[in-house]
C-alpha cells in the first residue's frame, strides 16, 4: 500500500483531489451524548481491514477540520481514526452561548469527554489496540 505524502508546493490541490475524496469515502460523522444536551461531535474514518484504532485529540481553539491530513495518513496505514471535537470546539457542545469563546468550567471535562469517546471506540473495535495522538492541549 502506497501512501501519498502531500507536497507543500501543491498542498491545496492534493488535499482536494486525494485526501478529501478518500476521507469522504471512508468517513462518518456522529454525536455522542455523555450528559443530557452535551453532544460531542466526532469524525470517524474506517479504512478497509483496520488493524488498530488511533484517537486524535486536537489542540486548543482547533477542530476536526484541521486534522484531515493526519487522519488521512493514519487511515492509509490501516488505522481506524476517531477525531472527537472537545467541548467548546467545532460542532461539539459549548458552555457559553457566544460561539466565539472557548469557555470551560474544569479542564477535567476535556479528559472525561475524551475517555467517553475512547470507550465507545473500544466497544466498536473489540480486541484492537488503541493508540492516542494529541497535539498541544490535546
Please provide the spans of the model-predicted regions.
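An N-terminal hydrophobic leader/cap segment in hydrolases
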Residues: 1-33, 40-46
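Active-site glycine-rich loops that stabilize anionic/oxyanionic intermediates
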Residues: 51, 58-62
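Alpha/beta-hydrolase fold active-site loops
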Residues: 51-54, 129
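Structural cue for short, hydrophobic secondary-structure segments
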Residues: 56-59, 83
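Alpha/beta-hydrolase active-site loop
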Residues: 102-123
Amino acid at each position: 500500500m502506497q501512501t501519498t505524502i502531500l507536497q507543500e508546493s501543491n498542498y491545496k490541490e492534493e488535499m482536494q483531489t486525494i485526501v478529501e475524496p478518500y476521507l469522504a469515502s471512508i468517513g462518518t460523522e456522529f454525536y455522542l451524548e455523555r450528559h443530557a444536551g452535551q453532544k460531542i461531535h466526532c469524525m470517524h474514518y474506517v479504512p478497509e481491514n483496520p488493524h488498530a484504532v488511533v484517537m486524535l485529540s486536537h489542540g486548543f481553539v482547533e477542530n476536526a477540520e484541521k486534522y484531515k491530513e493526519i487522519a488521512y495518513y493514519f487511515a492509509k496505514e490501516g488505522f481506524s481514526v476517531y477525531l472527537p471535537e472537545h467541548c467548546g470546539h467545532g460542532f461539539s457542545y459549548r458552555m457559553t452561548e457566544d460561539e466565539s469563546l472557548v469557555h470551560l468550567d474544569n479542564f477535567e471535562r476535556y479528559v472525561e469527554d475524551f475517555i467517553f469517546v475512547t470507550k465507545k471506540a473500544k466497544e466498536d473495535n473489540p480486541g484492537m489496540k488503541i493508540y492516542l495522538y494529541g497535539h498541544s492541549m490535546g
